[in-house]
Swiss-Prot record:
Pfam families: LRR_8, LRRNT
Lineage: superkingdom: Eukaryota
Keywords of this entry: Leucine-rich repeat, Membrane, Repeat, Signal, Transmembrane, Transmembrane helix
InterPro entries on file: Leu-rich_rpt, Leu-rich_rpt_typical-subtyp, LRR_dom_sf, LRR_TM_domain-containing, LRRNT
Main location class: membrane
Gene3D superfamilies: Ribonuclease Inhibitor (3.80.10.10)
Residues annotated as signal peptide: 1-32
Protein's recorded name: Leucine-rich repeat-containing protein 3
Membrane topology: Single-pass membrane protein
Species of the source: Bos taurus
Family to which the UniProt record says this protein belongs: Belongs to the LRRC3 family.
Domain LRRCT span(s) in chain numbering: 145-198
Domain LRRNT: 33-64
LRR repeats by residue range: 65-86, 89-110, 114-135
Length: 257
């Protein structure tokens, strides 16, 4: 007890469970942000900034209550299935300026209902993973990817909600119709072009070539069969002609009178 009769702070009783609660609180603070990332306050919500950290894969220790996640300007090449399945409160996901080439069909499972913006611009996507993106209601940015303009891409775009601010920057890096290489995809589609019609024409030509091949084989076999039968018939006829003729035998019942 101090000189004034009051207890010193060090002598105050510690509430039951106090050290444990303090330890849990410290652990929660330490685990609230992935290593090498920053988690600033974002309007009272959890924001995780992992931009330009040299990451080669999506971190696994992202807090479950994250609302904004920035993974841009890294070296991520692949988004595996279930990479964000525990982030049910996520609203914005920035994966731009990476090296993403493949996206698993269930890469964004768990985000379909809440995600509002998905940025996949400036990556290495040649084809749109319709199974992964088709179920999302979020605005999607796909600009500056080396997309191959074909029927599958056109069909995938019909199911996506593209970000209107960047849709004009989606261009054909390669195309089934070479005249559209380097041109904005939306401009090509607005002109009335259908990459699917080219696909169907190619399929029809292949089918016609196959049918013609089978028809030619059948005709060849029929001609060979007819000629072989004619040759056999000719040989048989020559054989019959080569046989010696036999004189007719006299009828024993007939006698001279």
């Amino acid at each position: 007890m101090g000189p004034t009769g009051r207890q010193s702070p060090s002598s105050l009783p510690v509430p039951a469970g106090g050290p444990c609660l303090l330890l849990l609180f410290c652990l929660r603070l330490g685990a609230s942000c992935p290593q090498n990332c920053q988690c600033p306050d974002h309007a009272g919500a959890v924001a995780v900034h992992c931009s330009a950290r040299g990451l080669q894969e999506v971190p696994r220790d992202i807090p479950a209550d994250t609302v904004l996640l920035k993974l841009d300007a890294n070296k991520i090449a692949r988004i595996p299935n279930g990479a964000f399945q525990h982030l049910h409160q996520l609203r914005e996901l920035d994966l731009s300026q990476n090296a993403i080439e493949t996206i698993g069909p269930a890469a964004f499972s768990g985000l379909a209902g809440g995600l509002r913006l998905l940025d996949l611009s400036h990556n290495r996507l040649r084809r749109i993973p319709k199974d992964a993106l088709g179920k999302l209601s979020a605005k999607i940015r796909l600009a500056h990817n080396p997309l191959h303009c074909e029927c599958a891409l056109q069909e995938a775009l019909w199911e996506l909600k593209l970000d209107p601010d960047s849709v004009d920057e989606i261009a054909c890096h390669t195309s089934v119709q070479e005249e559209y290489v380097g041109k904005p995809l939306i401009q090509a589609l607005d002109s009335g072009v259908s990459f699917c019609s080219v696909h169907h024409k190619t399929t029809d030509v292949a089918m016609l070539v196959t049918m013609f091949g089978w028809f030619a084989m059948v005709i060849t076999y029929v001609v060979y069969y007819v000629r072989q039968n004619q040759e056999d018939a000719r040989r048989h006829l020559e054989y019959l002609k080569s046989l010696p003729s036999t004189p007719m035998s006299k009828d024993p019942t007939s006698s001279a009178p």
